[in-house]
Amino acid sequence: MLKEFREFVLRGNVADMAVGIIIGGAFGAIVNTLVSDVLMPPLGLLIGGIDFSNFYLVLKEGSAPGPYAALADAKAVGAVTVNYGIFLNALISFMIMAFAVFMLIKSLTSMRGKPEPPAPAPAVKECPYCCSTIPLKASRCPECTSQLEK
């Protein structure tokens, strides 16, 4: 059983998939940091000093009544919130990651090139008696007049 597991793991597809998952996770972390730490702060500054991660909607106030200055304050007093700013950050991260994967797949596809079309089926055959070329559907050779098998 250990030998079978070793063969399974050492197969090319499994190792490639493992590397892809590890690199994908690291790439996801980079994109998340890009969105939350690089893209969103300047965008919030342009809009008026807004931190998108602090966009939330209070469904139920916590032990201290609102309004709360930040999402962390609302969570600290146990308020129930819908955190749509964090969702917005995640949505932008997803869009960037999806676009990057699309561009990667598109470039890989263009490097491979188009597959060659299969060769067309022959429209002619050779007469077994006189070796002349005859149509594929012929039942009699026009050169030697031999009866052909179908």
From Swiss-Prot:
Keywords: Cell inner membrane, Cell membrane, Ion channel, Ion transport, Membrane, Transmembrane, Transmembrane helix, Transport. Gene3D superfamilies: Large-conductance mechanosensitive channel, MscL, domain 1. InterPro entries: MS_channel (IPR001185), MSC/AndL (IPR037673), MscL_channel (IPR036019). GO terms for molecular function: mechanosensitive monoatomic ion channel activity. The chain crosses the membrane at residues 19-39, 85-105. Coiled coil: none annotated. It is a multi-pass membrane protein. GO terms for cellular component: plasma membrane. It is found in: Cell inner membrane. Homopentamer. Belongs to the MscL family. Channel that opens in response to stretch forces in the membrane lipid bilayer. May participate in the regulation of osmotic pressure changes within the cell. This is Large-conductance mechanosensitive channel. It comes from Chlorobium limicola (strain DSM 245 / NBRC 103803 / 6330). The gene is mscL.
